[in-house]
Amino acid sequence: MSGLSESAKLVKEALEQRGLETPMRPNNVSREEKKEKIEHHMREILGLLQLDLTDDSLEETPHRIAKMYVDEIFSGLDYSNFPKITVIENKMNVSEMVRVKDITVTSTCEHHLVTIDGKAAVAYIPRGKIIGLSKINRIVRFFAQRPQVQERMTQQILVALQTLLESDDVAVTIDATHYCVKSRGVMDATSETTTTALGGIFKSNPATRAEFLHGLR
């Protein structure tokens, strides 16, 4: 894990210890080599689907997909992309709940590689440390940018924040539409999946839990 930030190392280790890391096998393939190999195989796949890759609308599609996978929608598989985190001492002695809601979640279902689209809400009770508000959004985005299962993603965000804040008092909920349900299979266009992960006082204290959930309405 050389070259990773201290925050990235701590979060990765915490997830591995809890069995919550996304299933991955490390390799030494560079970003550019990954894109070259993905582009090559994507040409084969699209050719097997009888698409004419000499057409000017399609000829760059394998390259676009490879770049999108490595640099964008699956960039969260690489911990060198973990956001730079600002955590400061709670010198103001803030003790009330901090809640960020309506955080955009755009991820990819790891079963069919189609879109998961939704919103997240994150809350924590400040103890010794406070995290920059935009960092919460960036952490959500980091874990969304990989093939995912919503249940695991919710837990990953929880553990990442608990680790960085050095506090169990964190809550996360995600409401999302899964296009593996909406656009294929059962083709249910209206259903939504909700997952919640609660830690510390959010799990042990019904009043705190209710305050968090009530604030999402």
From Swiss-Prot:
Pfam families: GTP_cyclohydroI. Keywords: GTP-binding, Hydrolase, Metal-binding, Nucleotide-binding, One-carbon metabolism, Zinc. Zn(2+) binds at C109, H112, C180. The keyword Nucleotide-binding applies. Its EC number is 3.5.4.16. One of its GO terms (cellular component) is cytoplasm. It catalyses: GTP + H2O = 7,8-dihydroneopterin 3'-triphosphate + formate + H(+). One of its GO terms (molecular function) is GTP binding. Signal peptide: none annotated. It comes from the Bacteria. Pathway: Cofactor biosynthesis; 7,8-dihydroneopterin triphosphate biosynthesis; 7,8-dihydroneopterin triphosphate from GTP: step 1/1. HAMAP family: FolE. Toroid-shaped homodecamer, composed of two pentamers of five dimers. Belongs to the GTP cyclohydrolase I family. This is GTP cyclohydrolase 1. It comes from Vibrio campbellii (strain ATCC BAA-1116). The gene is folE.
